Amino acid sequence: MWFGKVRFSDKLFAKVKIDEMVESPGMKYKHYAPKTRCILVKSAENQIRKINDLVLQNNNCCVLGFLEDEKYINIPSNRFINLGRKNNLKEISSNIFSSLTKLDKMGCELAIIEGVEESGLGLSIMNRLVRACEYNVM
């Protein structure tokens, strides 16, 4: 995978087996992963619909999403964790750790996480979220 003139390993988003040799330590272990089961919903035209479908199917869930999308997601406000503004990837990246740690305190069985576009800083954000969700991605 190429990002400008930089080539990323094809294993960047691949699940790594525990006994597999990796290119860097950050590829093998979970970092900032909550105990709460998580699903990451990739950025797409139908992202909000997918999130709302998951909310309907799961009574005890919460959503980590973007400020401007909160009004479109059918979940009580006390079950919504604001990651920041969709167009402010720096804000989102600085909120990931605290947002993931809030999940376990909320007592939800499932966390549905709104993903960002996989380019620029968004690539790094998605890599972190994919690993936090243990590769459970829609």
For each predicted feature, which ranges?
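Internal gly/pro-rich beta-alpha loop/helix module
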Residues: M1-F8
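A C-terminal functional module that forms or caps the active site or interfaces directly
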Residues: E23-E134, M138
